Amino acid sequence: MNYTLTKADSDNNNKKYPKQTIESVSDPLEEYLKKNIFMGKITQLLHKLVNWGRKNSLWPYNFGLSCCYVEMVSAFTSVHDVARFGSEVLRASPRQADVMVIAGTPFIKMAPVIQRLYDQMLEPKWVISMGACANSGGMYDIYSVVQGVDKFLPVDIYIPGCPPRPEAYMQALILLQKLINEERRPLSWVIGEQGVYHKKMPSERVQKRSKRINIINLSTSEKI
């Protein structure tokens, strides 16, 4: 049996069909688009506004492990003027910071302390791994050093070097600002139907691992 949907004529008060009641049927897809195009644009504008404020007001946590921390602090001097990027306000408490820079060698004894400080930071939060020791353990391939801080923390930006220069740290801030501006950062703790759960946030290395493995042609240093 074929069914035909007829739009009701509200002006005539259903005079065309006096013996039956006609229900007005609206297209749910059309209503969905009308509703969400407008609300979606407002949501996008709000997210862009929030991301703009976040990327220009980063609050790094005053936290260092070894020699790379000296290069990080050098970026806060008047020579480099990191205040141009809105991240010159070092916070003494993790509850007032949203960026953690792992500058130095992460020892196994320090890993639980770093994890606890990271958990106390504000949401959303970002992690910068600064230096070869923080990236992969560096030259300390021994039992007492964690071979990469991304073993227990989700890292967003990696800074190579031993130690990296302050300009490299400033370049990392620029990359972090682009990252914040382009994506909607999820919260680590999510409230769902089954209660509150911890969202797994993989590091940048894990996310790009398959793409890097499939690379056949390597780019020159000028194109990187």
Swiss-Prot record:
Cofactor: how bound: Binds 1 [4Fe-4S] cluster.
Record's keyword annotation contains Ligase: no
Localization, UniProt: Cell membrane
Binding, [4Fe-4S] cluster: 67-68, 133, 162
Cofactor(s) it depends on: [4Fe-4S] cluster
Broad class of where this protein is predominantly found: membrane
Functional description taken from the UniProt entry: NDH-1 shuttles electrons from NADH, via FMN and iron-sulfur (Fe-S) centers, to quinones in the respiratory chain. Couples the redox reaction to proton translocation (for every two electrons transferred, four hydrogen ions are translocated across the cytoplasmic membrane), and thus conserves the redox energy in a proton gradient.
Name of the molecule in the record: NADH-quinone oxidoreductase subunit B
